[in-house]
Amino acid sequence: MTSDAVNLNQFIIALLEASYRSLTQATEGLTDEQLSYQPTAETNAIAWLVWHLSRWRDAISATISGEPQIWVREGWAERCGMPGERTGMGDTPAQVTAFRVERSVLFGYVGAAHHVTVERVSNLTPTQFVQPIVSHTGERRPAWRTSAGVCGDSAQHSGQIAYLRGLMSGYGWRR
């Protein structure tokens, strides 16, 4: 057994990177039609999932770090034709179905949000991890707990994306 302590920043980054690799692999080569595929009228499409996952990472890492969200600061909201405060939390099935963003813009934001989130997390201090922040439910909790939730959501959503890809492409798409 080693005495090396696990660095929380590196651990969170490893989880974020794993889900980003999964969603990148699962979306590679998909058409616009496939990105918008919904198995039922009340399920999330891949395009919406990758956007929402990225918005949530950007919003939470910005809150914890005290930096502005790139969604607004870098004009992604405007390019996507959406309000700056929209994250996908609470979107209705109709909003999910209506979600359409040009592929290059969507994946431009997805990549930018991933990279800025990793950068922010790499620079967080122990004090920032224990600071209380208000969650989307209104609950005050330490930033590390919210970060754990973001990692869990990222894993769930990247898994949903991979599942949808499998539904469309069948066995062997990951080769």
Describe the role of every protein-language-model region.
Residues 16, 20, 27, 110, ...:
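Hydrophobic alpha-helical core bundles mediating ligand binding, dimerization, or RNAP-core interactions
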Residues 83-131, 148-150:
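Acidic/histidine-rich alpha-helical segments that form the ligand environment
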Residues 1-10:
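Basic/polar N-terminal segments that are highly enriched at the extreme N-terminus
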Residues 9, 13-24, 34-89, 132-175:
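Short, contiguous alpha-helical
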